């Protein structure tokens, strides 16, 4: 919250920019501190990014409020509540260093997905069965890695006690991108590999 007056006011954008930098600093620290074998490029697993910044109601009016929305990734070994605490402490440190923010502390809300990380061993039979099926179809070994983003597999693994693998066609980099698409040959490969894995796993042959 700021004050919507020009030279004598408090521009919410200026205060919001401090929060943006605080989030960037937290991201850098998490990049330095966290590692996981399924994420060789750990930066892809740990987004800590202000994705939306909304302030003001009119072009010539000093904004007195700013709303920031952040995308925050967690590693499989992390607890979401602990990561939320890290964010809260980081924002609090920045607010304490600014007289206005100290008197008017930012309000934090953690909502939307709030997804825990989840994993199963790469040695698990379901992983190896699907990997073998993929190799039979393509003639090459699959790359076994973690992925970033909310997925329902966490419910099956952590609450349903059901080992689960994410597998499908296309490139992860193309997901949710402009002109998102999946090549037909990728779809054929994925479908065939899944069919072979099901046959093997269920002992149908």
Segments (PLM) and residue ranges:
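Metal-dependent amide/peptide-bond hydrolase catalytic core
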Residues: 1-205
